[in-house]
């Protein structure tokens, strides 16, 4: 009996010890989850009205360096910047009657306040099918293939979201809208990181399932998440449904993306048809290296065997339908972020919404990216703007409805219009000229907002009859990329004026990055890329920002309708 009692006591003690150990482990796990890295922004949150980011010129004695020589950036003066004074609003009367003067006109009523972000390009730097190699020589405009900022795309978005939250506390937004190219390579895991950052989830920007790297850019962190009071909406961009933003993913590309071998592809820079060829391995980032060294990239002849990586099925390409579906897998509002559940079945990425109760205004979200069938016009790729008859007919119906219902209208699309024929696919039906001519028949259309070019350009699209029908003119405002310098987003404040015209105030904002943070490092690398890669001059150089008051004439009907706001 004594032996049995001792055994029983021993068993009980053992169970208690195991339970205590389990509790300790659970406590450690809880502490671990609460101690996740966070990247708070700077205490002072300003817009470019107050302060701008001005790049410092590279010393004339510095050598030309290649984009991948990141460790040399600071040594030779690449990527340096300084804060500078802010820039005010430039008052634009381009689409107003020629005799119009705003001398005695005052801003009287606030109608709508919202923000736009675009071209975030969340990038899986360990994917075997990015196009890194084509950007390593610093050729013109090829920073789209590689830039040293690509390991930090998740961190920049997190900083921008926190900046929005701080501005929202000062003056609430009615909504926010993201203008396409949420991701870089049409991958599921890139899309999940994007949505999860906006939802405030834990982000692990490391897609190698066997990696133990702890460099700052792959370390798990807790995203802040967009303030839950702010509704956000989504636009489809070419990178969201095309491989590298240019090609419908072929079966070979789809297989490679989830495989263990780095993509071997032909020189698609010289000839887009080389997508089916071979000759160059695209490379990946060595995430154990401080500066994100590129490995497994170069001519096929330089390798004795194909370079390998660890496969991950979450890197898979997503169709339009699958891309839309992920916006229903979100904890922020609204459900689906503008898309209908029916669009999951159809892949139709157009919709409308009315952001403010009792305000006669609707936003028309238009998918103006090329079709997935890969049938492009001469010299066009999937990076061009286009409509097919279905989307054009839908757009016309929505414009007709908005006009007949007496509502002001904003079109939100990814690709801009009216900036040159090179931007629009010649195979589009309608043509760009036909589209613009149709838009000019709607006096209630006030604004077209877009991204795509990574610029902060503002374009006036004046009425075809400026003397008799000035209200047929409208404005186009582009929002720069969070990936490339100037790494900014935009605020919009639409106000009623004392003469019942309206003014659209648009303001650029730099994410309020904290010194020493990954997002601050990204800003420096973005500036360095703009100094290394030759290309078209940056609009509004050297800061790339542009703030404006855009005045728009309304019809007599709409002037009467909004005069009490």
Briefly describe each language-model feature range.
Residues 1-10:
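Bacterial N-terminal signal peptides that target proteins for export
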Residues 128-130, 189-192, 247-248, 377-378, ...:
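Short coil/turn segments at secondary-structure boundaries
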Residues 124, 184-186, 240-245, 372-374, ...:
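Active-site environment of divalent metal-dependent phosphoester hydrolases
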Residues 116-118, 176-181, 228, 233-238, ...:
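Active-site neighborhood of phospho(di)ester-bond hydrolases with catalytic His/Asp-centered motifs
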Residues 20-22:
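C-terminal motif of bacterial Sec signal peptides marking the signal peptidase cleavage site
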Residues 26-168, 174-175, 234, 254-405, ...:
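Metal-dependent phosphoesterase/phosphodiesterase active-site architecture
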Residues 373-393, 400-449:
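Active-site-proximal segments of metal-dependent phosphoesterases and phosphodiesterases across multiple
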């Amino acid at each position: 009996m004594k032996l049995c009692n001792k055994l029983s006591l021993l068993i009980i003690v053992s169970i208690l010890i195991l339970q205590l150990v389990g509790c300790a482990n659970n406590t450690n796990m809880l502490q671990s989850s609460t101690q996740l890295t966070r990247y708070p922004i700077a205490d002072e949150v300003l817009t470019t009205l107050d302060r701008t980011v001005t790049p410092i010129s590279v010393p004339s004695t510095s050598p030309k360096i290649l984009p991948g020589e990141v460790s040399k950036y600071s040594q030779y003066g690449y990527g340096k910047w300084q804060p500078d004074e802010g820039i005010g609003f430039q008052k634009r009367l381009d689409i107003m009657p020629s005799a119009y003067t705003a001398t005695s006109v005052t801003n009287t009523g606030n109608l709508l306040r919202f923000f736009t972000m675009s071209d975030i390009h969340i990038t899986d730097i360990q994917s075997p099918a990015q196009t890194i190699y084509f950007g390593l020589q610093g050729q013109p405009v090829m920073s789209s293939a590689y830039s040293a900022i690509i390991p930090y795309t998740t961190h920049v978005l997190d900083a921008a979201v926190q900046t929005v939250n701080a501005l929202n506390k000062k003056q609430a937004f009615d909504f926010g809208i993201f203008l396409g190219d949420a991701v870089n390579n049409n991958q599921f895991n890139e899309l999940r990181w994007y949505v999860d950052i906006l939802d405030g989830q834990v982000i692990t920007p490391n897609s190698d399932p066997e990696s133990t790297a702890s460099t700052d850019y792959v370390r798990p962190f807790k995203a802040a998440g967009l303030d839950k009071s702010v509704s956000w909406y989504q636009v489809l961009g070419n990178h969201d449904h095309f491989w590298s933003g240019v090609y419908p993913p072929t079966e070979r590309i789809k297989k490679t993306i989830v495989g263990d071998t780095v993509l071997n592809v032909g020189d698609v820079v010289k000839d887009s048809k080389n997508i089916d060829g071979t000759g160059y391995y695209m490379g990946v980032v060595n995430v154990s290296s401080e500066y994100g060294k590129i490995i497994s990239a170069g001519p096929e002849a330089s390798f004795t065997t194909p370079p390998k990586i660890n496969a991950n099925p979450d890197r898979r390409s997503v169709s339009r339908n699958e891309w839309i579906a992920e916006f229903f897998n979100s904890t922020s509002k609204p459900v689906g972020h503008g898309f209908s559940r029916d669009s999951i079945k159809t892949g139709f990425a157009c919709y409308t919404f009315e952001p403010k109760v009792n305000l006669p205004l609707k936003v028309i979200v238009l998918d103006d990216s090329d079709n997935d069938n890969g049938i492009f016009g001469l010299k066009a790729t999937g990076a061009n703007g286009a409509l097919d008859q279905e989307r054009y007919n839908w757009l016309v119906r929505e414009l007709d409805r908005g006009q007949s219902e007496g509502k002001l209208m904003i079109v939100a699309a990814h690709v801009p219009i009216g900036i040159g024929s090179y931007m629009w696919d010649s195979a589009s039906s309608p043509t760009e000229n036909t589209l613009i001519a149709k838009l000019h028949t709607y006096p209630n259309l006030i604004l077209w907002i877009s991204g795509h070019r990574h610029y902060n350009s503002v374009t006036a699209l004046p009425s075809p009859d400026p003397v008799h029908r000035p209200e047929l003119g409208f404005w186009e405002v582009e929002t720069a990329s969070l990936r490339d310098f100037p790494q900014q987003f935009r605020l919009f404040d639409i106000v009623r004026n004392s003469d019942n015209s309206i003014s659209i105030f648009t303001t650029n904002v730099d994410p309020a990055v904290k010194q020493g943070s990954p997002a601050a490092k990204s800003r420096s690398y973005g500036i360095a890329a703009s100094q290394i890669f030759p290309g078209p001059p940056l609009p509004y150089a050297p800061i790339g920002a542009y703030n404006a008051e855009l005045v728009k004439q309304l019809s007599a009907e709409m002037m009467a309708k909004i005069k009490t706001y």
